[in-house]
Amino acid sequence: MILIGEKINGAIPSVGNAIANRDEAWIIDLVQRQEAAGADYLDVCAGTTPELEYDTLCWLIDVVQSVANKPICIDSPDPHMLLRVFPKLTKPGLVNSISMEGENAMCFFRF
């Protein structure tokens, strides 16, 4: 079984507050607690507005990778954002999910 720690998500109020304040120490503590709990991957979701998502994801990825022993699972409702930030990963990662609505999956898969 592969366990994905999904606590680094800006939709969670306390995490959203830490992200908004760029509280690196708070995020690092969350990374360490999830790894200690047995997570195989660390899910990273900005949970911000589309205008802030790229910069927020880049910051989160940098912070998480600075201390994490585990790879990252990128989480965004925007498939183009996933493609944009995925190259920042220093270890092979995962994409959390891609909606099959409309043309969303076409940027990843050729049918």
Question: In which residue ranges do the predicted regions lie?
Answer:
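Aromatic/hydrophobic pocket-lining residues that form the small-molecule binding cavity
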Residues: 27, 57, 82, 105
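Conserved, mostly hydrophobic/aromatic
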Residues: 34, 85
